[in-house]
Amino acid sequence: MRSGVIAQKVGMTRVFTETGEHIPVTVLKLGNCQVLGHRTTEKNGYVAMQLGSGTRKTVYLPKAERGQFAVAKVEPKRKVAEFRVSEDALIPVGAEIQADHFVVGQFVDVTGTSVGKGFAGGIKRWNFGGLRATHGVSVSHRSIGSTGGRQDPGKTFKNKKMPGHMGVDRITTLNLRVVQTDVARGLILVEGAVPGSKGGWIAVRDAVKKVLPADAPKPGKFRLADGGGEQTAAAPAAEQEGV
């Protein structure tokens, strides 16, 4: 199981195929997505990689986080996340994952925070039908109607669909196809819509319900921090004390 990446949503556009067909795509940008540390079975009880993306000023960081970035020998990151991986898919600490970590044609799962809609009624939030337009209905055309029984059960049950805050939910969209990658600019173009607003952080992983293509690099496509060039072969994971 390979690692995912942390990307930032740029927006939507479209690309044209050789036959003239246009495909709506979402542009995701990798902003110096580097490995910050490893989680091992011996130390933590599970295997994972901690990644960081974006940039952040050191003056705004707590001391504990400063030490974490110092041990990894990377610049402070704005977004930090963990990805579960198999032991043979660990990438060296400090390495920067490239956009061609994903290959054209493969499917990915993307996770983001949906756009906030504020307080919404039952029709917008839950797709309720509302009340009738005439036949005695006044003012309450868009109300949700009754929320419970009369004598039995005599109450409104918990988790009843009602008006309330809508949006700002963690949403995962499955099986989006990778249409194109741009290593020089760090861009990944996926077919379809991705949850979240422009500038929002997105986690991109290999699709769990699709077979990984045979040409997908393992453990991944990355560039070493010491300028050793792009790598695809597995490298031994160095022990990171305190990471």
Curated annotation (Swiss-Prot):
> What are the start and end residues of every segment in region (Disordered)?
139-164, 218-243
Cite the record's note on assembly. Answer: Part of the 50S ribosomal subunit. Forms a cluster with proteins L14 and L19.
The family database entries (InterPro entries) matched by this protein are listed as: Ribosomal_uL3, Ribosomal_uL3_bac/org-type, Ribosomal_uL3_CS, Transl_B-barrel_sf
Looking at the record's lineage, which domain of life comes first? Bacteria
Q: Which residues carry this modification: N5-methylglutamine?
A: Q151
- Role: One of the primary rRNA binding proteins, it binds directly near the 3'-end of the 23S rRNA, where it nucleates assembly of the 50S subunit.
Q: What is this protein called?
A: Large ribosomal subunit protein uL3
List compositional bias (Low complexity) regions by residue number: 231-243
| Keywords, comma-separated and alphabetical | Methylation, Ribonucleoprotein, Ribosomal protein, RNA-binding, rRNA-binding
GO terms for cellular component: cytosolic large ribosomal subunit
List the SUPFAM superfamilies.
Answer: Translation proteins
GO molecular function per UniProt: rRNA binding; structural constituent of ribosome
User: What are the BP-aspect GO terms?
Assistant: translation
User: Family, per the entry?
Assistant: Belongs to the universal ribosomal protein uL3 family.
Q: Which Pfam families match?
A: Ribosomal_L3
Source organism of the structure: Rhodopseudomonas palustris (strain BisB18)
Q: Per its UniProt record, what HAMAP family does this chain match?
A: Ribosomal_uL3_B
Q: Does the keyword Coiled coil apply?
A: no
Q: How is it modified after translation?
A: Methylated by PrmB.
Q: Which NCBIfam families does this UniProt record tie to the protein? A: L3_bact
Keyword Ribonucleoprotein annotated: yes
